[in-house]
Each structure stands twice: as C-alpha cells, then as structure tokens.
Regions:
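Terminal alpha-helical anchor/extension segments at protein ends
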Residues: 1-141
Length: 141
C-alpha cells in the first residue's frame, strides 16, 4: 500500500458475526464481532403466555421483535465503532444484514455514509477468502 493511499476496510457480516478486515500500510488486521442475536428469542415460558407489564399483556412476538431489534442495533453500533475511522468501507455478506447495516450508517451516521463504496452479496467463505476478496476490491496485493 502506498503512503498516500486511504485507510480501507471490508466487513463480511451476517446476523451472527462480523469479520472486519482493516488494510493499512503493509498490514492487514482482522477482527471478529459476535452478535447476541440468539438471545433475542423466547425466554422460558414466554412462548406460552407472553410478557406481563402492569396492566398490559404483550404478545411474545412483540417482545421478541423488540429484543431482536435492540440486539441488532447494538451489534451494528459495535461494528461501526471499529470501522468509523476508515476512509473507505466495503460491505459483503450472504443475507439482508449487510443492507440493514448500510441503512443504519445512513440513518445514524450520515456524515460517514459516503465512505461506503460497495455493498455486495457474498456466500459464507473461509477467512482467507474473505481477506482476498476485500484486498481484490481495493486492488491491494
């Protein structure tokens, strides 16, 4: 990488984990962030009776949906904190989470939305292949 090149990073993500690949001067740093998405589902007994809150009875679907939304937002905040200082961001992944992450950045961090250079579909890959794909995108050998 030349000295005048920008700091680039790629994010491979799905609903369970994100792999962040930061490309700096002559170095590649890889980090993993796990989501807590599995915790978003039913607690014991909740699928039968729902949750009670004072005089209200909330359906378990509403409670689970809110819990899932909050966990997803926390997950996206963690990822963004790791990549916010990069000049260019490349997002890849197999499902809809990558689109929701891009929308999260556009809504919550408008000043940084221009850093997203691409958002591409990508199957589940081994770590080495994810790194290779991100390097290839940024034309780094």
């Amino acid at each position: 990488m030349q000295k005048n090149q920008k700091n680039c990073c790629g994010v491979w993500m799905d609903g369970h984990k994100a792999m962040i690949v930061k490309l700096g001067e002559g170095a590649t740093n890889i980090g993993i962030i796990d989501s807590d998405m599995d915790e978003a589902y039913y607690h014991d007994g909740e699928k039968i009776i729902g949750s009670f809150s004072g005089r209200q009875h909330e359906s378990p679907e509403k409670t689970i949906s809110e819990r899932k939304h909050n966990i997803e937002k926390k997950y996206m905040k963690q990822i963004f904190e790791e990549i916010k200082n990069n000049d260019e961001i490349y997002i890849i992944g197999p499902g809809e989470m990558r689109h929701r992450f891009e929308h999260f950045i556009e809504a919550e961090h408008k000043r940084d939305a221009h850093k997203i250079k691409a958002n591409d579909s990508c199957d589940y890959l081994r770590e080495v292949h994810i790194v290779d794909r991100i390097k290839k995108y940024f034309k780094i050998s």
